Each structure stands twice: as C-alpha cells, then as structure tokens.
Amino acid sequence: MGDAIGFVVVGLGMGRNRARMVKRTEGAKLVGVADINEERAQKVAEELGCEWHTDFRTFLDRPDVHVVWVMTPSGLHADIAVPSLEAGKHVIVTKPMEVTLERADAMIETAERNKRLLLVDFDMRYLKGAWQIRQAVAEGLFGKLILLEGRLKWFRSQEYYSKSGWRGTWRYDGGGSLAN
C-alpha cells in the first residue's frame, strides 16, 4: 500500500464511523485517530489498528499523513483545519463547515494560500432516500420542475443535547437544530 492516501480522523464521536470507512476503503490508509478523550482515542485505535493521540498536531509533521478529516463539534473545525492546512495537509470537515462566516473564510483562505484541498462532507446527500429523489427528478417522474421544497423531520430529545455539552450551543453548534 505504498501509494495509499494516509488519513487521520480527529474527533471520535461520529468520527469513529468515518475512521471505519477509511479503514475499509481501498487506496486509503488510516494512519491514526485523535480525540481529547484519551480512553476513546485508545479504544478506537485498538479496534482499527492505528495510532492514536489526544492532540491532532502530533500527526501534522508526518509525511504519511495526507488528509485530516475533522469530525469535532462544528465550532472547532477551524481550530483543527487551519493548522492542518498550514502543515500542508488536505482537509475534510463534516457539515456545517464552521459556525461563523469569518472562521469559514479563514479556512478557505488558508487552503488557497497553501494550495490544499478543503472539502465539506455533506453526508446526508448520499442517503438512499436522497438518491431516489435525485433519480426520480433526473428521469422526469415529476415533470419539469420549477421549484422543489422538502422537509425533514428529525426529532432530537433533550438528552441528545444535554449529554454532549456542545450540541445546540451557539459557540460550538451554530444554533442547534437550525444549523446541524
């Protein structure tokens, strides 16, 4: 696997699923994972057979790391993306890109200045239902569309917000269910 693209996944809440995806993707190599929760980082690393650290910066000087995948709370994306881009790594961030325009712009500017790729992972676009709608529209099932509106009802209990400490906050989630 000498030509494999080396990944580090930062933030192992939902990020553990992304790490598993990288692990089973041909042409990709999961070099490591990082999380501020040492026990979680170690557990995921042991499961997937990779290195772990509590500080993502530990991976930034490594030539075998090409991509940093940021899966932290939304309001922390720039804190990880900007130094990763400065270190010459490509970056994928989960949606939303960030919680303020200024922080998102800083990420874009850093990527452009360092000639690195910055991608936003809008994972819901790949759900089966989304693809079925796309296919139906492409096949003209609804005729010529002028406007399409959709609604997604997604219930989140108070426990969902309370157990994380960051979900639903303006600082780290950008407005809760309105943004994420």
Language-model features, listed with the residues they occupy:
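N-terminal Rossmann-like dinucleotide-binding module
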Residues: 1-47
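Hydrophobic Val/Ile/Leu positions in short beta-strands of Rossmann-like dinucleotide-binding domains
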Residues: 7-11, 70, 93
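Conserved acidic residues
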Residues: 31, 64-66
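Short, conserved SAM-binding/catalytic segment
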Residues: 43-50, 107-111
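Conserved SAM-binding strand-loop segment of SAM-dependent methyltransferases
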Residues: 49-58
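Beta-strand-loop-alpha-helix segment that lines the small-molecule cofactor/substrate pocket
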Residues: 67, 73-74, 78-125, 140
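Predominantly a Rossmann-like dinucleotide-binding segment in NAD(P)-dependent oxidoreductases
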Residues: 124-180
